[in-house]
C-alpha cells in the first residue's frame, strides 16, 4: 500500500510480543535502525485492562499513561514520527447490550482509552482509527478466530488490505505526501444537468433525490476546504454560465469565494489543470481530478499521469462516499486556520444545548443571532418552493397545493405578492424554509398560501414573514391583511398563527376561518429576533 503512494520502505520489525522491550531499551535494534516512522500495530488484546473494574477511571488513566509513556520513550530516543493503531472493540461480548451501561466493563474502558489516546496524541502522534475501520468492513470480518488460534493474527486476512491502505495514508500525511487540491468539474458533478442548456431553474440542486445528493457532495467539499484542501474548478463551459449557480442559486452550497481558481472555458482539461498547478504554484502530483465524464477522466489519466483521478460512479448519491474513500486527502493535524465553523450536523445539537442553557426563550432567540433573506420568487427557487408547497402539512394554513405552472403564473401576475424566506443563524444556513403567496384585492392583501418547514418551527420565522408582508402591503397602499385557516388533521399547530399576531377572526364558513389585520390602525408587525438582510455577505455575526 505504501509503495503505491510513492513511499519506499525499509522495514524493521520487532519480534512477536517484543515491541515494548524494543521501545524501552535505548540500545535496541529499533533505535539502531534510526526509523523515520514507528508504527505501533497493536490490537485490543494488548490492553492491560481487566474484564471488569471497580475503578474504571483509574484503570483507564493508568493504561493511557502506559501508552503515552511508550510514545515519550520513542520521542526521547529517536526523531521518529509515531503512528499507532487504536483498538477495535470486540464483537463477542458476554454481557451483550448491557455492556454499554457498565462503565467498568472492558468494552467501555476500551472505548475510553481510545478517546483519551486521541486527546493525548494532539499533533505529536497519528492514530489509525481501527475501531472505525472494523465497523466499515464489519466486526466479524475484521477478526477471524481461526487466524488468531493458528498464528495470533489479530486482524483477518481479508481486512489487512483495508488496514494497510489506511495506515499508509496516515504515514503519507505525516511525510507531507497527501494531495492538496481538488480540481472539480461542474455539470453533473456539482449539480445535475448542464447549466448552459437547462438554465438556473433546470439544474438539479436542492430538494429531491438527485438534488440532495449534489448538495451533500458540496457540503462534504466545504468540509474538506475547512481542513485545508484547496478547491478549484475546471469546466468546459462559458464562464458567464458557469458562475450563475455560485452567484444566484439558493441551494448552492459552494460560493465563488470558496474556489481558489475558477477556470471555465473551452480549453482541454489537461491544459487547464496545468494552468491551475502553475498559478497556485503546486505540483501536478498535489492535484486530484473529480469529473463525472469517463472520457475526460481517461484523457487526464493519459496526459497527466501525476494527477490522481477519482472514478465517480454513475449515481450521484455515491459521489460523497467515493470521495470519502479516497485516502490521500488525509491530514496529520488540524489548526485553527484550517477550520471555519461547526458543521451542520453538530449545529442542531448545539442549538438544543443553547436553548436548555438560556435564561428565557427571548434570550435563546437573541443568542441564535438569526438572519433572514426574504425575497420575491425567482425561477431558480420555484422547484424548491413547489416541493415545500407539495409536502408541508404541519405549519400550512390552507394546504393549497400549487404546481410549477401555477407558481410561474403567480410570478408573472402583478396582482400577486410572493415571498420566499431563507434562514441563517449562528450555526448554519437552513435554506429556503418558508413561503407566502397573497393577492391584492383593492385595499386588502389576501393571503392564499402561508407555510413553513417544520425544521424551523418555534424560531419566530412566521413573524418575520408577516412583517415582510406588512411592508409589501403598505407599499401597495393596502390598509388590511386577510388570511384563511383551513383546518386539517395535520395542521392544528398553525391554528393560532393569526390570533397571536393580532389578527381578528371575522368569519367561519364551512370550517374555514377568516382572519383580518387592520394595518392602518395597528401598524406593521415586527420581529426583533430575526434580522432581515439582503445577502449573507451583509449578515454580520452569523456563522
Task: List where the protein language model places each region.
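Conserved Lys-Pro-Asp/Glu-containing loop-to-beta segment of HAD-superfamily phosphomonoesterases
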Residues: 273-294, 300
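Substrate-recognition element of Asp-dependent hydrolases with the DxDx(T/V) motif
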Residues: 216-250, 263, 397-400, 406-407, ...
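Alpha-helical cap/lid subdomain in secreted, periplasmic
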Residues: 2-158, 165-181
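A conserved beta-strand-loop-helix scaffold within acyl/acetyltransferase catalytic domains
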Residues: 248, 373, 377-455
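Asp-based phosphoryl-transfer active-site loop
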Residues: 180-195
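Acyl-donor binding region in acyl/amide transferases
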Residues: 426, 432-508
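Terminal substrate-recognition subdomain of acyl/acetyltransferases
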Residues: 279, 301, 305-368, 471-543
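Basic, amphipathic juxtamembrane/active-site segments
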Residues: 195-221, 305-312
Amino acid at each position: 500500500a505504501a509503495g503505491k503512494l510513492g513511499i519506499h520502505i525499509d522495514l524493521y520489525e520487532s519480534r512477536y510480543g517484543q515491541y515494548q522491550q524494543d521501545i524501552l531499551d535505548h540500545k535496541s535494534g529499533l533505535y539502531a535502525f534510526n526509523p523515520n516512522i514507528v508504527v505501533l500495530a497493536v490490537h485490543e488484546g494488548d490492553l492491560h485492562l481487566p474484564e471488569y473494574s471497580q475503578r474504571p477511571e483509574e484503570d483507564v488513566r493508568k493504561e493511557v499513561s502506559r501508552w503515552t509513556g511508550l510514545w515519550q520513550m520513542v520521542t526521547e530516543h529517536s526523531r521518529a514520527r509515531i503512528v499507532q493503531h487504536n483498538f477495535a472493540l470486540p464483537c463477542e461480548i458476554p454481557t451483550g447490550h448491557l455492556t454499554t451501561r457498565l462503565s467498568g466493563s472492558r468494552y467501555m474502558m476500551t472505548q475510553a482509552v481510545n478517546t483519551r489516546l486521541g486527546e493525548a496524541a494532539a499533533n505529536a502522534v497519528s492514530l489509525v482509527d481501527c475501531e472505525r475501520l472494523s465497523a466499515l468492513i464489519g466486526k466479524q470480518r475484521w477478526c477471524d478466530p481461526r487466524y488468531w488460534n493458528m498464528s495470533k493474527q489479530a486482524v483477518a486476512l481479508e481486512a489487512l488490505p483495508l488496514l494497510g491502505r489506511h495506515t499508509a495514508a496516515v504515514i503519507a500525511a505525516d511525510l507531507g505526501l497527501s494531495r492538496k487540491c481538488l480540481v472539480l468539474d461542474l455539470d453533473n458533478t456539482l449539480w445535475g444537468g448542464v447549466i448552459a442548456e437547462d438554465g438556473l431553474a433546470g439544474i438539479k440542486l436542492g430538494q429531491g433525490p438527485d438534488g440532495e445528493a449534489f448538495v451533500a457532495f458540496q457540503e462534504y467539499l466545504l468540509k474538506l476546504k475547512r481542513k485545508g484542501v484547496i478547491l478549484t474548478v475546471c469546466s468546459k463551459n462559458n464562464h458567464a454560465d458557469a458562475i450563475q449557480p455560485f452567484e444566484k442559486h439558493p441551494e448552492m452550497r459552494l460560493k465563488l469565494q470558496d474556489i481558489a481558481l475558477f477556470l471555465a472555458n473551452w480549453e482541454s482539461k489537461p491544459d487547464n489543470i496545468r494552468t491551475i498547478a502553475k498559478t497556485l504554484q503546486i505540483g501536478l502530483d498535489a492535484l486530484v481530478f473529480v469529473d463525472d465524464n469517463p472520457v475526460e477522466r481517461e484523457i487526464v489519466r493519459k496526459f497527466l499521469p501525476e494527477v490522481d483521478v477519482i472514478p465517480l460512479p454513475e449515481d450521484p448519491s455515491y459521489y460523497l462516499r467515493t470521495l470519502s474513500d479516497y485516502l490521500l486527502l488525509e491530514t496529520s493535524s488540524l489548526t485553527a486556520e484550517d477550520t471555519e465553523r461547526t458543521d451542520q450536523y453538530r449545529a442542531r445539537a448545539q442549538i438544543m444545548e443553547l436553548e436548555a442553557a438560556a435564561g428565557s426563550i427571548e434570550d435563546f432567540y437573541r443568542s441564535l443571532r438569526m438572519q433572514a433573506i426574504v425575497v420575491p420568487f425567482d425561477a431558480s427557487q420555484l422547484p424548491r418552493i413547489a416541493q415545500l408547497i407539495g409536502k408541508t402539512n404541519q405549519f400550512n394554513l390552507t394546504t393549497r397545493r400549487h404546481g410549477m405552472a401555477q407558481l410561474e403564473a403567480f410570478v408573472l401576475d402583478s396582482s400577486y405578492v410572493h415571498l420566499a424566506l431563507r434562514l441563517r443563524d449562528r450555526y448554519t444556513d437552513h435554506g429556503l424554509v418558508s413561503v407566502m403567496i397573497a393577492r391584492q384585492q383593492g385595499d386588502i392583501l389576501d393571503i392564499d398560501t402561508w407555510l413553513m418547514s417544520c425544521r424551523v418551527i418555534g424560531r419566530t420565522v412566521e413573524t418575520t414573514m408577516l412583517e415582510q408582508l406588512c411592508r409589501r402591503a403598505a407599499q401597495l397602499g393596502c390598509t388590511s391583511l386577510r388570511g384563511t385557516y383551513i383546518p386539517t388533521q395535520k395542521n392544528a399547530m398553525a391554528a393560532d398563527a393569526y390570533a397571536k399576531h393580532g389578527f381578528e377572526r371575522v368569519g367561519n364558513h364551512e370550517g374555514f376561518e377568516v382572519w383580518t389585520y387592520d394595518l392602518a390602525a395597528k401598524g406593521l408587525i415586527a420581529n426583533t429576533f430575526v434580522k432581515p438582510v439582503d445577502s449573507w455577505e451583509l449578515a454580520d455575526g452569523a456563522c
